[in-house]
Amino acid sequence: LRDVAAIERRLGAVEALTKNTVAREELILSLSGISDMERLIGRIAYGTAGGRDFASLRNSIERITEVKAQLTAFTTGRLHELDNELDTLTDVAQSIRDTLIDEPPFSVREGGFIRKGYNAEVDRLHEILSGGKGLLADIETREKEKTGIRTLKIGYNKVFGYYIEVSNSFKDLVPDTYIRKQTLVNGERYITEELKNLEQEILTAGDRDKALEFEIFTALRESVTAESVRIQRAAGLIAELDTLCSLASVAVNNNYCRPSVDDSGVIEIHDGRHPVVERVLKDALFVPNDTYMGEREDRAAIITGPNMAGKSTYMRQVALITLMAQIGSFVPAKSARIGVVDRIFTRIGASDDLAGGQSTFMVEMTEVSEILHQATPRSLLILDEIGRGTSTFDGMSIARAVLEFCADPKRLGAKTLFATHYHELTELEGILPGVKNYSISIKKRGDELIFLRKIVPGGADRSYGIEVAKLAGLPNEVVKRANVILKELEQGGAYQAKPREETEQVSLDAIGEAEVLAAIRRAQPDTMSPIEAMQLLYELKQKLS
């Protein structure tokens, strides 16, 4: 967000949730039972939803009533607005509950998911599919009463299906509508039109039930889809509330503070911490750091210090705290004042783009180019070791030019955190207005290097690269040799690589021979005239000479 009023409104909601623990925990519990309604209504509208998707939507909607009841604890601010704006969608949930069973199957092609009592014909087909025992019992009772045959009973066999069996003692009471099918020792078996129709219904009930249930399901899908705008709006409000509860929970659990947000262009952080690094540290406490960046003074910070000292972590934490403040979140600091930025640009780390044919340095320069073209004076720039992918002088020149461009208010003048190992750049503090030197403090005890992780004013005097290499486990022989070479270089560049002219000449000869061989491979002697062959020989001889 870049509108201060919108940020403050969100911060106010987060603060209200941090202060009301009971309501916050109840809301989190209710929200945990709500599925992604936006995705569900999307599947329903596209016709790809199954029965379980409808059940998930129904269960989610029914939780909204709980959420609204819990929001009544907040009588002002954005949370009160959410209570007023949130649609309970009870009619949609009731429609799904009336139509479908509690736990419908995912596939709706096999039937068996319409709730009993919703449709009389579906209920009848379900009765038939269960063996028609109830229907057969009704027919048997009715026929006994109509004919007066007390021993009448209905049975089934595979030869002619359902039948009515009458004992010989009641044969005279058999009505003319009965059709005799089988004679037994003790009685007769008959069929009726009603039994034949019932048998036919039983044979076709499965297909008819599937078709009818799918027809009802399609109608339900269309009716729910018609309410998709309401459902999507409710889903958006639920997502906003879920975000606010999450931000409040994180703020309480990690001792975050509410930042002050304005349009001053000032970033002032007291005891800021990296929100991720402080959580993953197991055996040590995170060392907090202060930050001050203004629109005129301390606009650009040059940060020097050894590798592993914490330069990148510090710059990242400033960017993250700024970003967190502008999404309406509390921040990991004792206090923070954030002047709204329009964009945050970072150039940290790089690797080869093998598929694109770009080297590490080319990738780095491409990213820097995009930053310089897109950044504005209201942007925050995080630039880590620009120019390290090429030679020392080239890299230093590029780094200085980039820093001058970023810091100069006549060109860009954006707030910039610039980490570098080029200590020569620290002289810009006295040349460019708004540039300030900082370094990560360390302590050296004998050969041991202790990182204090604290950022302090002033540039570092050296990079301690060899000490860091030793910490990384380089062999002692290599470390000792590196120290010798470093001393020679520091004494005026006495250590120099000797030119290797012979190697260069061999390289040139090899290039000439390669060109000759390539020309011979391309030649087609069968199609060449004597003059053309002679001309080719002269050309090859000239290449070799």
Task: Describe the function of each predicted region.
Residues G50-D53, P525-S545:
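Short, amphipathic C-terminal "tail helix"
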Residues A226, R522-P525:
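Dynamic helix-loop-helix/coil hinge segments at AAA+ ATPase domain boundaries and subdomain interfaces
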Residues E15, I41-G42, R221, G387, ...:
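Amphipathic alpha-helical segments within well-ordered protein domains
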Residues L1, S167-E199, L244-I511, L517, ...:
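ATPase nucleotide-binding head domains, primarily ABC-like/P-loop NTPase cores
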Residues L1-A309, T313-F345, E367:
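Alpha-helical coupling/stalk and coiled-coil linker elements that connect catalytic or binding modules
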Residues T18, I44-A45, A325, L372-A375, ...:
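Hydrophobic residues in alpha-helical segments
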